[in-house]
């Protein structure tokens, strides 16, 4: 199993954000010692006219605006292809919650994915930070990248019914015939994407284009410099923006880092190893209870998990939902739960349902949440956007042997995710069959100007492993904040040590110590 898992935002961060961040001493907003590396901020490509927009009510994007009455929203038009600025345009949805006091500038946030909506994130975050120095001194701004969320055109490759059918297929048979089937499913998905969205749109959906979009949003805000907080995939976007538009960055925090120098296969293997670590942490916690469905013998945790989940390849598990629990949904639900200990109880409940032959519906709920399926059976486009962006962000090997070798390595580093035995064959990843060529290649991040960036990395982060943060901080020449925890991302999730360091940096440019380490 070599597919990448989407790097989702940690929604629980919004619950505690407002509790720790008030009352910090203030200084003038410019960052002391901020200098630019030679050549940074150069922007090749055809000239594009600065966007014009009007700020209006957010009801077009947000159903309930009662808690964000001061918020204003707009759409910013950007060229689908920046080499043809007068051609087809995409419209980016943007939300801005204005600072309540002396304004230091705009703080743009990106929740990750790729595919997650920053408009929705800001709408949820703003009420939680209403009484803090962040919203007192910064406009809180989110924009949905091209194809994502409330931006148009929305990238959709599947109907709701087609996505449901996709989830019912276990795609676990790695015999030659099974591999042929999986690759045919991937080819059909890729072709559906091209047929429904067009080759040109897919060729320009990548992070390189989104970084240019972000600068168009900066211009629409009227600011020469922005502040930026990127979670997960948002760190990749931040790094790309810094590389192209470094002179327009005042302060940037990258949490849950992606190493831009790593190949897709190596990134996938590293991520799978991270999920295995998180699984082990979950199982150890579960084993404190005699009712744990995985038992108390650590040597048997993986085997017991497979004994519960693998039979779903042949027959769905019981749920109150008539769909039942497929093998794919059980795996996806497990992955979702491993993003945060706050979700572990739902994983335990679902596994107990499988063990007892009763309702395993909590795993289905977790899978629906991950895949963006609502109670009416309608899907967000998060997953389609995730696939389309990652497939053009880096070239993926088409050689089947590379994926057989990857499957063998993944079975070693993440046995809980590996169905059956190694067969000597394995399907290529969706991106290896994607008809649109990659528009970027992996490369180390260039050193940032002094004081431009702070990197945060969590020791047992399943989706963006800790070492990626270490490596990105080294490439950028940036200080690293280490959080000792088992979760995906840490900033504004209630840890006083992390949050205070980040707040001081945004407010007055105070950099954390080079190797700051924060306990849970």
Curated annotation (Swiss-Prot):
Its membrane topology: Single-pass membrane protein
GO cellular component, one term: plasma membrane
Coiled-coil ranges per UniProt: none
Catalytic machinery residues: 232 (nucleophile), 461, 488 (proton donor)
Keywords: Cell membrane, Hydrolase, Membrane, Signal, Transmembrane, Transmembrane helix
InterPro entries: AB_hydrolase_1, AB_hydrolase_fold, Serine_prot/Carboxylest_S33
Domain AB hydrolase-1: 105-403
Its EC number(s): 3.4.-.-
Keyword field contains Hydrolase: yes
Homology family: Belongs to the peptidase S33 family.
The protein, known as: Putative hydrolase Mb2247c
